């Protein structure tokens, strides 16, 4: 099950059944038809649980008898489309949800009453996400939450609604419409809180922390590996120079303080500068060890 579906099923289970949620679902996934008996309303989704949720919202609020239909786009089960079909009281439903103008082309944004009410705004965002929202699985890397709108003013109203909740929402033109999106992990987690998906928020946060911890460990390991490589490279250069001195003139020609360092380096090729410094009596500073190693290297270079 995708992370998007998990979020949607969680908010369905915790739905407040506010009419703003139903308004978003119908506005973004619905279409109006006309028969000899009057207007019909169809709301379509590829998720059976969302279809059942819409069915129950309409049935409970308007005391009508919707039909739940389905068909396959192809022979693949995952492409099954579910439609809640309403053939009675459609005018009353559209009027109650203030959607009549939306379906007849006069108003494609979000109702002012929803934009101005925080609770209604939360419910509308919940319905909008149920209708066309997606959120990238946090395990897969780059974070992204999107809600698709056919009309630009609706996408921009969604962004304004999100900004009321301190979310950094942006709008991008997309094929056949517009996308309102969030890209920051913190904004996505806050959005999940706004729409009531607390469990999904906690899962998202846990995955985010684990990914960041893994990345930090990888960076630390890479840095440590690089440091070890540099230490070994520098150590081998000095060891080769010490061997050159031994083979050419012998270590006995070195002053005592340099001979002591040379013998330690030959005996402990994997030691860091700090470890060499700590092994000398009395202990030296790292800069003191480096100074003596430079002298040894210069002597070898001059031979």
Curated annotation (Swiss-Prot):
It holds the Pfam family WhiA_N. Keywords: Cell cycle, Cell division, DNA-binding. One of its GO terms (molecular function) is DNA binding. Residues 272-303 bind DNA. InterPro entries: Homing_endonucl, Sporu_reg_WhiA_N_dom, Sporulation_regulator_WhiA, Sporulation_regulator_WhiA_C, WhiA_LAGLIDADG_dom. GO terms for biological process: cell division; regulation of sporulation. It comes from the Bacteria. PANTHER family: CELL DIVISION PROTEIN WHIA-RELATED. Involved in cell division and chromosome segregation. Belongs to the WhiA family. This is Probable cell division protein WhiA. The gene is whiA.
């Amino acid at each position: 099950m995708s992370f998007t579906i998990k979020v949607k099923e969680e908010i369905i289970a915790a739905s407040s059944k506010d009419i703003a949620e139903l308004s978003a679902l119908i506005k973004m996934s619905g279409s109006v038809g006309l028969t000899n008996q009057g207007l019909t309303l169809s709301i379509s989704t590829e998720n059976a649980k969302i279809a059942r949720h819409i069915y129950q919202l309409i049935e409970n609020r308007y005391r009508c008898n919707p039909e739940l239909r389905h068909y396959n786009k192809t022979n693949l089960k995952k492409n099954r489309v579910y439609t809640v079909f309403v053939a009675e009281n459609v005018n009353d439903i559209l009027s109650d949800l203030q959607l009549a103008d939306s379906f007849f082309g006069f108003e494609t944004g979000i109702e002012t009453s929803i934009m101005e009410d925080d609770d209604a705004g939360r419910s509308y965002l919940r319905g909008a996400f149920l209708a066309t929202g997606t959120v990238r699985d946090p395990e897969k890397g780059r974070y992204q939450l999107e809600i698709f709108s056919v009309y630009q003013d609706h996408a921009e109203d969604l962004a304004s609604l999100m900004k009321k909740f301190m979310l950094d929402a942006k709008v991008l033109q997309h094929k056949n419409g517009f996308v309102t999106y969030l890209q920051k992990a913190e904004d996505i987690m806050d959005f999940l809180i706004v729409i009531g998906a607390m469990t999904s928020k906690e899962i998202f946060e846990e995955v985010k922390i684990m990914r960041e911890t893994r990345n930090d460990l990888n960076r630390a390991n890479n840095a440590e590996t690089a440091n070890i490589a540099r230490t070994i490279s520098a150590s081998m250069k000095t060891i080769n120079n010490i061997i050159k001195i031994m083979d050419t003139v012998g270590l006995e020609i070195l002053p005592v303080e340099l001979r002591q360092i040379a013998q330690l380096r030959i005996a402990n090729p994997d030691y860091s500068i700090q470890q060499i410094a700590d092994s000398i009596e009395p202990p030296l500073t790292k800069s003191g060890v480096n100074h003596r190693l430079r002298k040894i290297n210069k002597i070898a270079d001059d031979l």
